From Swiss-Prot:
The keyword Endoplasmic reticulum appears for this protein: no
Family membership: Belongs to the methyltransferase superfamily. RsmH family.
Function: Specifically methylates the N4 position of cytidine in position 1402 (C1402) of 16S rRNA.
Protein name: Ribosomal RNA small subunit methyltransferase H
Cell compartment(s), UniProt: Cytoplasm
One GO location term (cellular component): cytoplasm
Enzyme Commission (EC) number: 2.1.1.199
Binding site for S-adenosyl-L-methionine: 33-35, 52, 84, 106, 113
Annotated organism of origin: Lactobacillus johnsonii (strain CNCM I-12250 / La1 / NCC 533)
Enzyme class: transferase
Single GO MF descriptor: rRNA (cytosine-N4-)-methyltransferase activity
Length: 315
């Protein structure tokens, strides 16, 4: 089975990295490798290090990028099976200690992960509740749904899914699991449908969409690891190096925007005649507003509708 995933904002993400021959670049979310392949095509010399916590994605990449993975005087591509929040320690293990020239993120779940029923990400297929991007971790969706308290469930659904019926759904989950465990995705869909009023189910897409998103974010601590990784990535960038981040959820975009703002602005104390050397900004924003998909891409790739790209450069 091929890892078929159409990359979003492909040219915008890589072109804004301003890649240079001989550079060292990190693909923090390798997936199907679409962005990496385009980046490698722009480099006569240079290396891309691809991170992915999904073992399936790594195994597929080893097949489709066999030529680029060949060990030579200067490898074109190196793969790391780990979460992108462990950037520094993995780079050190690879003997890289003098920084990187660029890094990019394509956040969220890839199409193949959604389309594999056994992964339990989608409400479209009946499968055991799972939703783990890293199959080796213990916490899964089944554990959250069947063991977390009603308040914890309600908070997750509201905070990560913007689900306005979070309390009703959490209450219904707790009531239902008292009768028997909620084992599969369809079990959970049935509970959610029962909890949401009929008038609300008739509009706004699938009634389980927001809840499934919220539980997935909680399972993988997506917002926590994103913040941790961005902070680390900015430190690892060499002066002139750039960071590109594609988000699909408002929660993700808020984190990226906040961190970019934190490192690109300086608060000057009142009365101070000049900016102290240690108070100068770390980043320069390449675009004040997020870059969105073109009209052509919106027609070709439905996934691009909610995509936002933010880019910054290390000073």
């Amino acid at each position: 089975m091929k890892f078929k995933h159409k990359s979003v904002l492909l040219h915008e993400t890589i072109d804004n990295l301003n890649p240079k021959d001989g550079g060292l670049y990190v693909d923090a979310t390798f997936g199907g490798g679409g962005h990496a392949r385009y980046l490698l095509s722009k480099l006569n010399k240079g290396t891309v290090i691809g991170f992915d916590q999904d073992e399936y994605a790594i195994s597929m990449a080893k097949e489709s990028f066999a030529k680029e993975l060949q060990v030579g005087a200067e490898p074109r591509l190196m793969l790391v099976h780990d979460n992108f929040c462990h950037l520094k320690e993995n780079l050190v293990e690879l003997g890289i200690s003098d920084g990187i020239d660029g890094i990019y993120y394509d956040l969220g779940v890839s199409s193949p992960q959604f389309d594999q029923p056994e992964r339990g990400f989608s409400y479209r297929f009946d499968a055991r509740l799972d939703m783990r991007m890293d199959q080796s971790q213990e916490l899964d969706a089944y554990t959250i749904v069947n063991t977390w308290s009603q308040k914890e469930l309600s908070d997750v659904l509201y905070k990560y899914g913007d689900e306005k019926f979070s309390r009703q759904i959490a209450r219904k989950i707790v009531d239902r699991r008292k009768e028997k465990p909620i084992v599969t995705t369809f079990d959970l869909v049935d509970v959610i449908k029962d909890a949401i009023p009929a008038y609300a189910r008739r509009s706004g897409g699938h009634p389980a969409k927001k809840s499934f998103q919220a539980i997935r974010v909680a399972v993988n601590d997506e917002l926590g690891v994103l913040q941790e990784s961005l902070e680390e990535a900015i430190k690892l960038l060499k002066p002139g190096g750039r960071i590109s981040v594609i988000t699909f959820q408002s929660h993700e975009d808020k984190i990226v925007k906040k961190i970019f703002k934190k490192y690109s602005e300086v608060e000057i104390p009142r009365g101070m005649p000049m900016v102290p050397a240690d108070s100068k900004p770390t980043l320069r924003l390449i675009s004040r507003k997020p870059i969105m998909a073109s009209s052509d891409e919106l027609e070709e790739n439905n996934r691009s509708h909610s995509a936002k790209l933010r880019v910054a450069e290390k000073l």
